[in-house]
Amino acid sequence: MSEHEAPGLGIGMMATEAMGLLIEAVEQIPSDAWDQPSNLEGWSIRDLVAHTTGSAAKVVTLVEGGEVWQRPSQPDDWKCEDPAARLRELAARLQDALPGADLNAIRPSPQGEVPLRRALTFPVSDLALHSWDVYRSQGRLVELPEDLLGFCRALLESIPEDMLRRPGAFGSALPVPEEATPTARLMAYLGRTVDPDG
């Protein structure tokens, strides 16, 4: 099993599943909700989706072997008229590129030159986590699929606390009730409010 991969499910399948999860979340955004605040401070739902579209494009570009940018995707760079259609187009490109992808090919990443399977871990987890944010921004709490949840948790637990909490990354961990679900526990650990009334 490769680093941060869930048992029995490779990074390519993770990427496909996370992309599908994001598309499903975006397709459910009401037309009048796009400019409402998201659950992430300073971002509208439109900003959140645009940022995550950039992460989706990074996943596809890494698999295709193209040139990737080494900074977080800025919302203004990825806004478009039909975000769901753009994501579906990226998903189709991913499906075309995955069968021939060499997961051991070297790709650039924030950690330097690493195998493709490792370079994909951060942007794929970004898709999964922000899919949850899209739902949360509409007042809904959803559960991440168990395999993606385990994938994200393993990755995040491997990051030193000072790096995880640096500005622009994740907020301080928040308390959760005893009956909190596994997804709620992870999101609260990342500084997300998981109170259904919050």
Residues of each region from the PLM?
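Structured surface interface patches that mediate subunit assembly and partner/cofactor docking
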Residues: 2-14, 18-21, 28-41, 61-79, ...
